[in-house]
């Protein structure tokens, strides 16, 4: 019985801490525009179709890398 009460109190305490922390952190993100431009530049920085995409290349393909020829391919269009 004691253990059950201790577990219930611990769960309630942790839940309260989570709610207080989540409510307190709203609107405190710094450098929002810098973060979003970084994501966009990473998303558009890719290898075009027809170029080599083997394991030594640091960029990813805009489409997919053919497993046999190691050449970037565009996704097939329906």
UniProtKB/Swiss-Prot annotation:
Keywords: Calcium channel impairing toxin, Disulfide bond, Hydroxylation, Ion channel impairing toxin, Knottin, Neurotoxin, Presynaptic neurotoxin, Secreted, Signal, Toxin, Voltage-gated calcium channel impairing toxin. It is found in: Secreted. Disulfide bonds join 46-62, 53-65, 61-72. GO terms for cellular component: extracellular region; host cell presynaptic membrane. Residues 23-42 form a propeptide. InterPro entries: Conotoxin, Conotoxin_omega-typ_CS. Expressed by the venom duct. It comes from the Eukaryota. The presence of a 'disulfide through disulfide knot' structurally defines this protein as a knottin. The cysteine framework is VI/VII (C-C-CC-C-C). Belongs to the conotoxin O1 superfamily. Omega-conotoxins act at presynaptic membranes, they bind and block voltage-gated calcium channels (Cav). This is Omega-conotoxin-like Ac6.5. It comes from Conus achatinus (Little frog cone).
